C-alpha cells in the first residue's frame, strides 16, 4: 500500500512536470520566431514586440484571479481549460496576419497559461503531503530551464527545416497530446491516491496532522517576502534579458556567439533549485534566512563584476547570480505557498507571488534599458548590486518573525 502511494505520487509529479514543461514550448516559440517573422517584411520589430508584450501583460494580470479560482473550483478543470486555450492559440496563430489579431490571440494565450501553475500547485498539495509534496514542487521548478532549452532547440529545427509557422504548429500538436494525457491520466491517479489515503486515514488518524495556526501577513513578515519576491524578479530577469547585449558591448563578440554562451545559463540555473531545497530543509530551515544568503552571495558576485572581469569571469558571475535567483524563486514562488495549506489559499498565494515576480520582470525590462542608455554598464552593474542588497535586507528583517510563524512543510502536511 505504501509503495502504491509512492508510485501514484511519482506519476502525479511526472504528469504535472510534462504539463508545465510543455507550456514553455507554446510561449517561447514566439520569441524564437521573431527574427524569421521580421525578415518576411510583413511586420516590424515594434509591432511584433507589442504582440510579445500582450502575452506578458495578460499572463501577469491573470495570475491573481486564476490563483483565486484555483482555490474555488476544481484545479483539474482549470488546468484543462488553460491547456486547451494555449493549444488553440498556438494552432491558430500562423493563420493570423494582422498585428491586432496576433495581439488578441497571444493575449488569450497569456491568460490560458496563467491558469496552469497555481492550480497545479494546489493539486499537488491536495493529493500528497509532507516531503512528497516538497519533492514534487521542487521537481516542477526544473521545468523552466528545461522548457527554455527544449523550446529553443525545437524552434531552431523548425526554422531551419521549414519556417516560423511550424514553430507554432509543432508546439500546438505537442500541447494537444498533453491535453489528452492530462484528461486521461489525472482521473486515474486521483482514484489510486484516494484508495491509498483512505486506509491510512482510518488506521493512523494521528499521522497526518495539519497545523491549524493561521498566518498573519503583517505579523509573520510575509509582506517583506513579497517585496523580496518583487526584487528577485527585477534582478533575475534584469540579468537574463540583458546578458547577450552586455557580452556584445563589453567584450565585442558577435551576437550569435553571445546567444550561444548565454544558453549555458539555464543549464547552470538547475543547481539553484537543488540548493534552495537542500539549504531550506537541512541548513537554514527558514525561507527568509535561505533567501538572505542567496541574495548576499549575489551581491558579492556583482561587486566583483564591478571591478572589471574578463569574459569567463563575467559569465561565472552571471551563472552564480542567476542560479541564486532561481533558488529564491523556488523558495518564494514554489515553497512559500505550501505554508498556506491550512488557510486553503495555496493557489491564491501562488498566483499572487507569481504575479509579483512578473511585475518585477516587467520593471526590469524598462528600468535597466533606461539605466544602460543614461549611465552605461557601470551604472547598471551598480543598480544590480543595489537590488541584491535591498533583497537581502527584505529577507533578513522578517527572519525571526517568520521562524516563529512558519509551518514545517516537510512533516506537518
Model-identified regions with their sequence ranges:
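Extracytoplasmic gate region of multi-pass secondary transporters
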Residues: 30-31, 220-277, 329
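Conserved MFS/SLC helix-loop-helix module at the cytosolic interface between two early adjacent transmembrane helices
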Residues: 61-99
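Helix-to-loop junctions at the C-terminal end of transmembrane segments
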Residues: 62-74, 273-285, 372
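Cytoplasmic membrane-interface "Motif A"-like loop-to-helix N-cap segments
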Residues: 72-82, 281-295
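Cytoplasmic helix-loop-helix junction between adjacent transmembrane helices
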Residues: 105-144
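Helix-loop-helix hairpin linking two adjacent transmembrane segments in secondary transporters
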Residues: 139-190
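C-terminal transmembrane helical hairpin of 12-TM major facilitator-type secondary transporters
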Residues: 286-335
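A late C-terminal transmembrane helix in Major Facilitator Superfamily
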Residues: 340-375
Amino acid at each position: 500500500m505504501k509503495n502504491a502511494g509512492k508510485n501514484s505520487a511519482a506519476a502525479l509529479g511526472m504528469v504535472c512536470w510534462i504539463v508545465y514543461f510543455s507550456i514553455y514550448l507554446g510561449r517561447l516559440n514566439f520569441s524564437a520566431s521573431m527574427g524569421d517573422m521580421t525578415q518576411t517584411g510583413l511586420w516590424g520589430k515594434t509591432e511584433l514586440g507589442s504582440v510579445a508584450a500582450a502575452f506578458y501583460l495578460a499572463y501577469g494580470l491573470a495570475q491573481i484571479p486564476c490563483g483565486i479560482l484555483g482555490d474555488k473550483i476544481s484545479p483539474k478543470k482549470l488546468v484543462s481549460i488553460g491547456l486547451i486555450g494555449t493549444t488553440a492559440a498556438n494552432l491558430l496563430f500562423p493563420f493570423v496576419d494582422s498585428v491586432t489579431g496576433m495581439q488578441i490571440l497571444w493575449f488569450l494565450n497569456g491568460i490560458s497559461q496563467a491558469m496552469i501553475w497555481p492550480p497545479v500547485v494546489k493539486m499537488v498539495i491536495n493529493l500528497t503531503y509532507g516531503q512528497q509534496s516538497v519533492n514534487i514542487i521542487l521537481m516542477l521548478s526544473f521545468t523552466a530551464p528545461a522548457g527554455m532549452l527544449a523550446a529553443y532547440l525545437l524552434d531552431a529545427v523548425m526554422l531551419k527545416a521549414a519556417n516560423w509557422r511550424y514553430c507554432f504548429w509543432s508546439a500546438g500538436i505537442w500541447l494537444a497530446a498533453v491535453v489528452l494525457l492530462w484528461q486521461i491520466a489525472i482521473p486515474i491517479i486521483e482514484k489510486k491516491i484516494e484508495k491509498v489515503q483512505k486506509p491510512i486515514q482510518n488506521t493512523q488518524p494521528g499521522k497526518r496532522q495539519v497545523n491549524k495556526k493561521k498566518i498573519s501577513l503583517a505579523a509573520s513578515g510575509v509582506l517583506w517576502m513579497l517585496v523580496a519576491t518583487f526584487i528577485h524578479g527585477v534582478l533575475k530577469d534584469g540579468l537574463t534579458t540583458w546578458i547577450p547585449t552586455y557580452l556584445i558591448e563589453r567584450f565585442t563578440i558577435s551576437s550569435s556567439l553571445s546567444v550561444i554562451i548565454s544558453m549555458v545559463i539555464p543549464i547552470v540555473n538547475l543547481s539553484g533549485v537543488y540548493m534552495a531545497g537542500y539549504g531550506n530543509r537541512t541548513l537554514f530551515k527558514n525561507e527568509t534566512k535561505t533567501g538572505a544568503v542567496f541574495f548576499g552571495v549575489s551581491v558579492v558576485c556583482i561587486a566583483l563584476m564591478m571591478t572589471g572581469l574578463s569574459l569567463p569571469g563575467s559569465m561565472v558571475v552571471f551563472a552564480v547570480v542567476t542560479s541564486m535567483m532561481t533558488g529564491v524563486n523556488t523558495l518564494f514562488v514554489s515553497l512559500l505557498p505550501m505554508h498556506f495549506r491550512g488557510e486553503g489559499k495555496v493557489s491564491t498565494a501562488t498566483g499572487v507571488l507569481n504575479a509579483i515576480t512578473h511585475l518585477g520582470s516587467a520593471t526590469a525590462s524598462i528600468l535597466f534599458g533606461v539605466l544602460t542608455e543614461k549611465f552605461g554598464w557601470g551604472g547598471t552593474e551598480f543598480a544590480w548590486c543595489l537590488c541584491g542588497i535591498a533583497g537581502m535586507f527584505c529577507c533578513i528583517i522578517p527572519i525571526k518573525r517568520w521562524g516563529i510563524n512558519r509551518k514545517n512543510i516537510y512533516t506537518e502536511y
